Each structure stands twice: as structure tokens, then as C-alpha cells.
Regions:
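Bacterial N-terminal signal peptides
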Residues: 8-17
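Beta-strand-enriched cores of mature, soluble protein domains
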Residues: 22-174
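Bacterial N-terminal signal peptides that target proteins for export
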Residues: 1-9
């Protein structure tokens, strides 16, 4: 019995020594073209011009700009300047085109679709391309307008919450 316990103790010591010498698991970075998730927030202000329609809901053009803050994820700048222009036909079709520009001048281009720009409305976007380090980027994101405030003379401003998306960049660019 004493021999069995000695052998078991020796086996445990050997196993512990082997485990201590084993290389630690290396956490690999995602492949350059792997899908990567991101989260953030955005605020925007600009102008909205409206035109009456037969439905009673006005058609509108909108031009917005403001900061985008990326709060989670990797591979993107943490801050962008966002610009968007778009059209709401007054009958439920809203289409916008946007561009995010980082501090180096590299850009991400987007196409946005959704409901009228108003509080509580959701917007879905497709990332359609980029320049510089974002060349070859594609993906998608969405957000909800937490609030949209309209002031006199067509001025509009708002804050979006729940900005979440994913992207990948073709090839070896990061």
C-alpha cells in the first residue's frame, strides 16, 4: 500500500512538472478577413427640408454630421466624423448614404435604410467599402435614435444608441 501511494505521489509530481513546462495557450488574433464585431454611439446634427405629399406625410431630405465613438471591438479607429445625406419619400422609404472619416483621413462608406429619422426609430446600414486602411471593408450595423429634436428653420439633432455591427476586410489589410 505504501508503495502504491509513493508511486501515485511520484506520478502527480511528474504530471505537475510537465504541466508547468507546457507552453501557455497562445491566443491567436483573428484572421485579417475574419468577421469582427463592434459597438458604439453616435450623435448628429444638421438640416431637414420637407415637401408636402398627397399622403399628408411630408417627403424630406436630410443632411447630418457628427461624431461616432467606437466603444467595443478591435481594428477600427475609436473616433470618426460621420456625414450622411438622405431622402424620406413620406410613404415609408428612407434611404441615406454615409461616410465615416477617421483622424488619418481613412474612410468607411455606408448605405443606410430604415424608418423616418425620428426618436425611437431603427436604422440598418450596410458597409459598402472604404479607403486607406479600410480598403476592402464590408459589413453591417444598426442603431436606434434615442432622441431627435427638430428646431426652427429645419435644424435637426439627435443621439443614437445601440450602435452594433460587424465587418471584415478582404485580404491582408488591417
Amino acid at each position: 500500500m505504501k508503495t502504491v501511494l509513493s508511486l501515485m505521489a511520484a506520478a502527480l509530481v511528474v504530471a505537475a512538472a510537465i504541466a508547468a513546462q507546457a507552453p501557455a495557450a497562445v491566443q491567436q488574433a483573428p484572421a485579417p478577413d475574419a468577421w469582427r464585431n463592434f459597438e458604439g454611439s453616435l450623435s448628429a446634427s444638421g438640416q431637414r427640408q420637407t415637401l408636402p405629399t398627397e399622403s399628408g406625410r411630408p417627403a424630406a431630405t436630410v443632411q447630418l454630421s457628427g461624431p461616432v465613438a467606437i466603444t467595443a471591438g478591435e481594428g477600427l479607429s475609436r473616433a470618426f466624423r460621420s456625414e450622411a445625406i438622405g431622402f424620406d419619400d413620406g410613404a415609408g422609404l428612407t434611404v441615406l448614404r454615409g461616410v465615416w472619416t477617421d483622424d488619418r483621413g481613412d474612410r468607411i462608406f455606408t448605405r443606410l435604410n430604415g424608418e423616418t429619422v425620428a426618436s425611437g426609430r431603427r436604422i440598418a446600414a450596410t458597409i459598402t467599402g472604404g479607403t486607406g486602411r479600410y480598403a476592402g471593408i464590408t459589413g453591417e450595423y444598426s442603431f436606434e435614435w434615442q432622441y431627435v429634436v427638430e428646431a426652427e428653420a429645419g435644424a435637426i439633432s439627435g443621439r443614437a444608441i445601440g450602435l452594433r455591427g460587424r465587418y471584415h476586410i478582404e485580404g491582408t489589410r488591417k
